[in-house]
């Protein structure tokens, strides 16, 4: 980009997608926090702070979107398993609707952007037939 003072856009998904992503993953199958941490990273949210993920899970539980229960194992320490509750399913439906609307807008935006780039690339790059003729001596 140029040296202007405009801040360059950040790549990846915004942090506020963490809650929606956690609900999606828990809706697919009950899961432990560590498993969710790995799955979130694989979906493109980038490196997620484990503390932030567990805080989000606790808030979602407090808000009645998920429930948790302890799963005891003879092979290791007890682990908390998270499950989606009906309010979490409603919230997930609402997010899906909002994301569909965002997808529609982004498709329009990117289509228009592609047309600009296409137009500018043909304006700035001379076609081979328009190359200047070599100078000849008289």
Model regions and ranges:
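Short, hydrophobic-biased segments on the C-terminal half of alpha helices
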Residues: 54-61
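Glycine-centered, phosphate/nucleic-acid-interacting loop/turn motifs that mediate DNA/RNA or nucleotide
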Residues: 64
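Short beta-strand "wing" residues that participate in macromolecule-binding interfaces
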Residues: 68
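Intrinsically disordered, low-complexity serine/threonine- and proline-rich regulatory segments
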Residues: 1-21, 25-28, 78, 95-105
């Amino acid at each position: 980009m140029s040296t202007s003072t405009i801040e360059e856009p950040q790549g990846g998904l915004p942090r506020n997608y963490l809650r929606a992503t956690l609900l999606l993953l828990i809706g697919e199958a009950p899961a432990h926090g560590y498993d969710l941490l790995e799955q979130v990273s694989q979906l493109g949210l980038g490196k997620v702070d484990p503390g932030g993920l567990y805080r989000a899970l606790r808030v979602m539980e407090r808000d009645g979107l998920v429930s948790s229960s302890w799963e005891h194992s003879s092979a290791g320490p007890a682990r908390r398993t998270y499950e989606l509750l009906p309010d979490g399913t409603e919230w997930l439906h609402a997010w899906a609707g909002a994301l569909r609307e965002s997808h529609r807008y982004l498709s329009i935006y990117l289509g228009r952007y592609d047309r600009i780039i296409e137009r500018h690339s043909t304006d700035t790059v001379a076609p081979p037939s328009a190359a200047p003729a070599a100078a000849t001596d008289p």
